[in-house]
Amino acid sequence: MSKSEAEYRQDIIDVGKLIYQKGWVAANDGNISFRLDANRILCTCTGISKGMMKPDDLIVCDLDGNKIEGSRERTSEIAMHLTIYQMRPDVRSVAHAHPPVATGFAVAGRPLTLALLPEVIIGLGCVPLADYGLPGTPALTAGMLPYIPKYDAILMRNHGLVCYGEDVYQAFFKMETVEHFARITLVAELLGGPKVLPKEEVGKLFDSRTRYGVKSRTPMEPGRPVVAEDVEQCKERLELTRDELIALVDEALRLRGVLT
């Protein structure tokens, strides 16, 4: 059953509060939108905390970003939302924020593409990293274009995370999944490095999508993650004896003036 516009507005307000309470945005960060119909987008305004919005603060604009309704100014990153809607007819909501751990990976230039968690593989595949683009300009979206058709969550280099889905809550839950995945990945790295699932197991997880009601556009989509076999192919094993290792360390220390 379809909701009223007032209910969709309240969904954005409620999710705005959630991302603020979780610490995924600070001050006026972030933006959320919802596709009302074929010609109208409901979106957050600029210059306001996403945890302190009211329904009347939201803006209605057309598919060119022109304001149709609202007393405030629409988000400066509306072009990113519109591009996603244009490229993905199945998407009805887009959420952008700066969840700290996921954004830390983006700042470090690290995509979240390893096949580690069944829930992430089934629901998202993996999370790629888009090239940096100046916020509020077309360059922001340019680096995302190769990923939008295949992925439902994209890390934005030195910026944050964008997620999208069939409604506001689905976009929010995907963002929550990515941040949770980033935290687990970070802990695994601190504990000696994550153990990546092999291709066969990842294939089984992709095959199980239908059972869990996850939509997939093509086999092994969205976003095939990096499997154990990929990692092994990238490894270059270096073997040293104890004496060779000591000599190598001594040489490095002498070059830095630590030893004479």
Over which residues does each language-model region extend?
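Glycine-rich flexible loops
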Residues: M1-T260
